[in-house]
Amino acid sequence: MQDSVSSKPKLLVVEDDYENQKFLQIFLKRKFDLEICDSAETFYEKLDQSKFDIILMDISLRGKKDGLQLTRELRATEEYKNLPIVGLSAHAFQKDKDNAYSAGVDVFLTKPVQNDVLMDTLVKTLEEKSGIKA
């Protein structure tokens, strides 16, 4: 849902670490109109308030629901079943990747991730899944 005022695609960053939030906000705003949330509660508030073109999901989100659960819930709805989701986690074991893909992420990245890899992955996933160029 690219904003008509801003020609940038809308990205929702789901990340509970404050330092990571700040970095991602500075780095990703070059190509995306982004909003950040830090919990399942604020995640659903953001979804109610705006339409997003892509989500960057912290798989290890702390709280009542982690990023895997949020991804499963999105995939179970008609409205969000095809929304591009890039999963991000510090856990790099094969079972972690398998769990993320089973939940419904389109791409799984391991923290720390190189800046250019993160940006390229978001741009490529958005274009491949939605036909939207960042």
Predicted regions and their residues:
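Active-site residues of response regulator receiver
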Residues: D58-I59, S89
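Acidic, metal-coordinating helix/loop segments flanking the phosphotransfer/catalytic sites
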Residues: I36-I54, R62
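Short amphipathic alpha-helix used as the core "switch/output" element in two-component signaling
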Residues: D66-K81
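Alpha4 helix (beta4-alpha4-beta5 surface) of REC/receiver domains from two-component response regulators
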Residues: Q69, A92-V107, D120
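Two-component/phosphorelay signaling modules centered on CheY-like receiver
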Residues: D17-I36, A40
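C-terminal output helix
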Residues: V113-L122
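Conserved acidic segment of CheY-like receiver
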Residues: K8-E19, L24, I54-I55
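A short, hydrophobic beta-strand element within the central beta-sheet of small alpha/beta folds
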Residues: K81-A92, V105
